[in-house]
Swiss-Prot record:
UniProt name for this protein: Small ribosomal subunit protein bS6
Annotated function: Binds together with bS18 to 16S ribosomal RNA.
Molecular-function annotations in GO: small ribosomal subunit rRNA binding; structural constituent of ribosome
Gene name linked to the record: rpsF
Composition bias, Acidic residues: 120-131
One annotated Gene Ontology cellular component of this protein: cytosolic small ribosomal subunit
Region (Disordered): 96-131
UniProt keyword terms in alphabetical order: Ribonucleoprotein, Ribosomal protein, RNA-binding, rRNA-binding
InterPro entries, sorted: Ribosomal_bS6, Ribosomal_bS6_CS, Ribosomal_bS6_sf, Ribosomal_S6_plastid/chlpt, Transl_elong_EF1B/ribsomal_bS6
HAMAP family found in the cross-reference section: Ribosomal_bS6
Alphabetical list of Pfam families matching this protein: Ribosomal_S6
PANTHER family: MITOCHONDRIAL 28S RIBOSOMAL PROTEIN S6, SMALL RIBOSOMAL SUBUNIT PROTEIN BS6M
Entry's family note: Belongs to the bacterial ribosomal protein bS6 family.
Amino acid sequence: MRHYEIVFMVHPDQSEQVPGMIERYSAAITGAEGKIHRLEDWGRRQLAYPINKLHKAHYVLMNVEAPQEVIDELETTFRFNDAVIRSMIMRTKHAVTEASPMVKAKDERRERRDDFANETADDAEAGDSEE
């Protein structure tokens, strides 16, 4: 089996359907003895340019190892699903399991925010004890 990177963008009005779509696509891959090495739901993001008069879309990234038949089926599903406004399936040489730069940056921002919240909470407690 070969390794693939799959990115698809969903219409922003259909964002609530994304978990179900991910579940269906994951079931199709694992049902054919494939493996999902990385699955990232990037959420609703700004598009670089308008597509069908839309300026935002819900992004999903998957790195999978699957047989060609499943990939062909996914490609057909993307093509005929009106909620999917763009998709890209790319063959890769190796399985990619590490977090994408997008997720790494998001985690770093979350850690900084948590550290700042902890520091301000500690400062507030120190101020209360001085009184």
